[in-house]
């Protein structure tokens, strides 16, 4: 485990991207018992607990308050619903988002936090070969930036951008780029057959 990786991390949402981050942390030596996942779907909770040994629970509670970092990993359209019961526990935490299109101002308004890092990892992150664009709000310290980068490092490369709007360009390139490569390779294989 990287010494800059946050010790206790809560994930709100337990889907594919949360699984990629959790898997990367556990594989790099992070203590699975220090990871808390709030996921309403029972099958997802059971999978994460079985696969990684994390604490997976159906709803937010005081265990989130013990985490210095929270990762918002829900579908963007479900963020407001997910944030409401979590806000009283996570306002003082460093908050990271892997939600496409949800701006830092929206996260701050819903969670009460100001230290927010927004990210846009791409699908190859699921196999540790991704690229994650990260943007940090001004309230995020250099140490917190390093902690955020350390959390994403096991999933691939980390690229910091200066403006939140720049994440859209990173998303267009890193998010769509692999799909075009896979499509191109598939077409080449079909042509060769």
Name every feature range the model reports, one short phrase each.
Residues 20, 47, 81-82, 106, ...:
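Phosphate- and divalent-cation-binding pockets in alpha/beta enzyme and binding domains
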Residues 106-115, 131-169, 182-193:
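Internal alpha-helical scaffold of NAD(P)-dependent oxidoreductase catalytic cores
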Residues 1-59, 193:
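NAD(P)+-binding Rossmann beta1-loop-alpha1 motif at the extreme N-terminus of oxidoreductases
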Residues 19, 23-27, 50, 84, ...:
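Short, well-ordered alpha-helices that flank and scaffold nucleotide-derived cofactor binding pockets
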Residues 177:
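Aromatic-residue-lined binding/catalytic grooves and analogous aromatic/hydrophobic interfacial grooves
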Residues 173:
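Catalytic, metal-anchored helix/loop core of enzyme active sites in primary metabolism
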Residues 42, 52, 60-134, 138:
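Rossmann-like NAD(P)(H) cofactor-binding subdomain of soluble oxidoreductases
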């Amino acid at each position: 485990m990287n010494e800059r990786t946050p010790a206790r991390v809560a994930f709100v949402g337990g889907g594919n991207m949360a699984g990629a981050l959790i898997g990367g942390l556990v594989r790099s030596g992070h203590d699975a018992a220090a990871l808390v996942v709030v996921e309403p779907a029972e099958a997802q909770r059971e999978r994460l607990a079985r696969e990684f040994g994390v604490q997976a629970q159906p709803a937010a509670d005081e265990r989130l308050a013990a985490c210095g970092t929270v990762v918002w990993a829900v579908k963007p359209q479900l963020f407001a619903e997910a944030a409401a019961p979590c806000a009283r526990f996570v306002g003082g935490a460093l908050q990271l988002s892997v939600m496409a299109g949800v701006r830092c101002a929206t996260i701050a308004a819903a969670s009460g936090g100001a230290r927010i890092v927004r990210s846009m990892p791409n699908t190859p992150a699921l196999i540790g070969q991704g690229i994650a664009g990260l943007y940090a709000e001004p309230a995020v310290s250099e140490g917190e930036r390093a902690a955020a980068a350390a959390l994403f490092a096991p999933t691939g490369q980390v690229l910091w951008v200066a403006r939140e709007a720049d994440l859209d360009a990173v998303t267009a390139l890193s998010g769509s780029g692999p799909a075009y490569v896979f499509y191109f390779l598939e077409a080449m294989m079909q042509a060769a057959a």
